[in-house]
Amino acid sequence: MSREQLSQEIIEAGRFLYGRGWSPATSSNYSVRLSASEALLTVSGKHKGQLGPDDVLATDLAGNSLEPGKKPSAETLLHTQLYLCRPQVGAVLHTHSVNATVLSRLTASDHLVFEDYELQKAFNGVLTHESQVVVPIFDNDQDIARLAANVQPWLDAHPECAGYLIRGHGLYTWGARMSDALRQIEAFEFLFECELKMRTVMNR
C-alpha cells in the first residue's frame, strides 16, 4: 500500500474506535508498518475521531520522528518494539475503553484468562473455545522505555499473545493488517465486558 492508503487506514480506524467509545478525546494511538525500517503513527495530542492526513507521521523503529515539526506519541516505543520483534505485525492499536481501564484496575493478578468463549476464535491461531486466551497486565509507567522493557520478556515468551493491558490505562493489540487489529479490538472488548458482567452477577 502507498503511504496515502496507509494513512487513510489510520484515519478510518480512529473514526471507528472513537465512535465505539474506545478512544475518547485525544487518548489512544495507532500505527501501521510503512517499511522494514519505518512506521506511520498518529501525531501526539490529536482527537482520534477527527484525524486528517496531517495527523500522522513517519518514524524510524527507534521511535524518532522523520518529519520535522511533528511529534509522535509518547508511547511510540510500545509500537515500534512490536514491529522490531514480530516481523509479521503490520498494525498496532492502543485504545482507552472504559471496560479495559476498569477491568485492569479491578484485577489484582498480573493477567486475565478467558476460556470457553466462542469469540476467542476471533484471535489469530485460536481454533476452539476449548482454549485459553491469556492477557497480561502491566503496571502503568510514565517511563515508556522502562515499560517497554517490562513488556518485552512476555512478548518473547508468548508468541501467541495477541494483546496486553496497561493497568488503569488501556489495551494494546496488533495484527498483520489493520483489519486484523480492529477485529481483535472488538473481540477483546466483548470479552472484557463479559468478564465485568460475570463479576457483577457472581459478586466477585
UniProtKB/Swiss-Prot annotation:
Keyword Manganese belongs to the record: no
Entry cofactors: Zn(2+)
EC assignment: 4.2.1.109
Origin superkingdom: Bacteria
GO terms for biological process, alphabetical: L-methionine salvage from methylthioadenosine; monosaccharide metabolic process
Pfam families reported for this sequence: Aldolase_II
Sequence positions that bind Zn(2+): H94, H96
Alphabetical list of Gene3D superfamilies matching this protein: Class II aldolase/adducin N-terminal domain (3.40.225.10)
Family statement: Belongs to the aldolase class II family. MtnB subfamily.
Record protein name field: Methylthioribulose-1-phosphate dehydratase
